[in-house]
Amino acid sequence: MAIFNHLPSSVLQCLAIFLSIIIEALPFILLGAILSGFIEVYLTPDIVQKYLPKNKIGRILFGTFVGFIFPSCECGIVPIVNRFLEKKVPSYTAIPFLATAPIINPIVLFATFSAFGNSWRFVFLRLFGAIIVAISLGILLGFIVDEHIIKESAKPCHFHDYSHKKAYQKIFYALAHAVDELFDTGRYLIFGSFVAASMQIYVPTRILTSIGHNPLTAILIMMLLAFILSLCSEADAFIGTSLLATFGVAPVVAFLLIGPMVDIKNLMMMKNAFKTKFILQFVGTSSLIIIIYCLIVGVMQ
């Protein structure tokens, strides 16, 4: 098109990077949205309650790893966890699920594998980091602090009961939820891709390099970026890989870990469902563990 001939080369480069990120991430967003829709309809708190172990440690581990079997996008995880808590699933089981389900599920792990050039390195770093955070939160809630974390006057989180619907109705609701999920997460992907592309083209390399030289500063910057961008976990690896050359391994791992656990949209939903004291404990504990973990990753490179 003739209009592109009049655009500066920097704009064209930015558009090329922007579109490449979108095209790479879109299939995973679509697959994740469809899966999220079926999880919303078919996975009930009663099913989770049925298979809970009897002891606390077992329940903490169950909450940590069940996300691999019953994955859920972080965009809809808070209402699901709130429903679990209302059904008397212990907080030390539900909150580890909140932390790991958007990260350890097969779609996100495969997206991470694909985004980083078919490398298992970031898959394992992301997986182990999420497990460490989840188990730590479970121990905190199970043995140290008051486990009652739901607001007494919490507003409903729009978790619908589909158990009495007919089979075709369940499929319809699952697909309808998938469409909503796709449009909801798509806007964050577009915004995140634009920011990542713009940073690579318009932010002077010397500034980014100076930030990247200080490991702690780089980790904090990437955590803040993940919080602001509020990307879906199926897509954040594609943003992370575009910033790898600038910031390095440890800050990108921090970006991949904190985003699905603590971002703007999640915080707003948590504020609606959970006590402020718990939210501060969750954010503080998660952030501190991720910082320490990523500093260790940086030293071990």
Curated annotation (Swiss-Prot):
Protein name, per record: Putative two-component membrane permease complex subunit SMU_747c
TM region(s), chain numbering: 15-35, 60-80, 97-117, 124-144, 188-208, 211-231, 238-258, 278-298
Membrane topology: Multi-pass membrane protein
Subunit record text: Interacts with SMU_746c.
GO cellular component: plasma membrane
Main subcellular location: membrane
Family: Belongs to the UPF0718 family.
Keyword terms, alphabetized: Amino-acid transport, Cell membrane, Membrane, Transmembrane, Transmembrane helix, Transport
Mutant phenotype after disruption: SMU_746c-SMU_747c deletion affects biofilm formation in a medium- and pH-dependent manner. Mutants show a reduced ability to grow in acidified medium, but they survive both short-term or long-term acid stress. Mutants have lower glycolytic activity. Deletion does not affect membrane proton permeability.
Annotated function: Could be part of a two-component membrane permease system responsible for amino acid transport under low pH. Involved in acidogenesis, biofilm formation and low-pH survival.
Protein's GO biological process: amino acid transport
Subcellular location: Cell membrane
